[in-house]
Regions:
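Glycine-rich P-loop/Walker A and Walker A-like loops and their local beta1-loop-alpha1 context
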Residues: 1-34, 38-41, 47
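A short acidic (Asp/Glu
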Residues: 15-22, 45-54, 108-111, 131-135
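Inter-Walker segment of RecA-like/P-loop motor cores
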Residues: 42-94
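Loop/turn-to-beta-strand initiation segments
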Residues: 74-80, 94-97, 115-124
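A short beta-strand-to-loop transition that corresponds to the Sensor-1 phosphate-sensing loop
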Residues: 83-85, 103, 123-127
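Conserved P-loop NTPase "ATPase switch" module shared by AAA+ and STAND
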Residues: 87-108
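ASCE P-loop NTPase helicase motor core
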Residues: 107-172
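C-terminal, charge/polar-rich interaction regions
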Residues: 183-259
Length: 259
């Protein structure tokens, strides 16, 4: 089941916003597990277009208390990035339809990490602002119903093998908070940098999130490590010798899997 939707917009595109609102209400009215619809953006100043549809006074009230409208069976709330993040510290059940208003991929990726989000509908402010997000998730366009071409999972079998092995050796903690896990991750990134020169940081981030279940913020840290090396910078930690042994093992595993 697809749970990611988008509309590309340039500036205050009321048609695109209307399509997002329609989709949000449609989902809320048909999915019994949905508890509410949340309009979400950076600050309260970013809800002017939403106010044109729901009313200024209503939007101001919905920051503190959800409201119901005839068109939607579930309560509707407005939330800024800061207030919604605080709410999510105490809630972890996916029951929200979140409409991200006038945002780009970088900030919508953060919403993906919230366990409260069952559906995400993203509306951009620039026409290419959501390219990375919609490609990662093969999001559906609410304006025409077409599916975005999904970002290909890295076709390099060695990279897939490396990331899967790395995840296991990190005991599937899926973050770098523990020293030993961080060291393991850095070793793998050093090896990928040395022996897989065609791999991009986004290849790593997308695969960790969509296939191995990492949170975006943690996967992005791993991608950033490779980015640093690609740019000629460095970082502390991780094994720097005997990396060819890792690479040789990946090749052997990849051949066995292919056979």
């Amino acid at each position: 089941m697809n749970n990611k939707y988008y509309a590309d917009a340039y500036g205050p595109d009321t048609k695109a916003l209307a399509a997002c609102i329609k989709k949000a209400f449609e989902i809320a009215n048909t999915d019994d597990e949905v508890a509410r619809v949340v309009f979400y953006s950076y600050t309260k100043n970013n809800f002017m277009q939403v106010s044109k549809f729901l009313g200024d006074d209503n939007v101001n009230q919905m920051f503190s208390r959800p409201m119901k409208f005839r068109e939607c069976k579930k309560p509707i709330k407005c939330a800024t990035a800061i207030t919604y993040k605080k709410e999510c510290e105490y809630r972890d059940t996916p029951k929200d339809v979140i409409v991200c208003c006038h945002m780009d991929s970088k900030d919508v990726f953060k919403v993906d990490d919230y366990r409260t989000a069952k559906y995400v509908i993203a509306l951009s402010w620039t026409l290419d602002g959501l390219n990375a997000w919609k490609a990662r998730w093969k999001a559906e366009n609410v304006l025409d119903g077409r599916m975005e071409e999904k970002a290909d999972a890295p076709k390099n079998a060695l990279l897939l093998t490396a990331l899967q092995e790395m995840d296991v050796r990190m005991y599937e903690t899926k973050n770098l908070s523990h020293f030993d896990d961080a060291e393991t991750c850095k070793t793998y990134i050093r090896c990928i940098h040395k022996y897989l020169p065609d791999v991009k940081p986004s290849d790593i981030t997308d695969y960790l999130v969509t296939e191995l279940g990492w949170e975006n913020k943690n996967a992005a840290e791993v991608g950033e490590l490779l980015q640093r090396l690609r740019e000629g910078r460095s970082f502390r930690g991780g094994q720097k010798t005997h990396l060819k042994e890792y690479y040789s093992r990946w090749k052997e595993k990849a051949v066995n899997c292919a056979g």
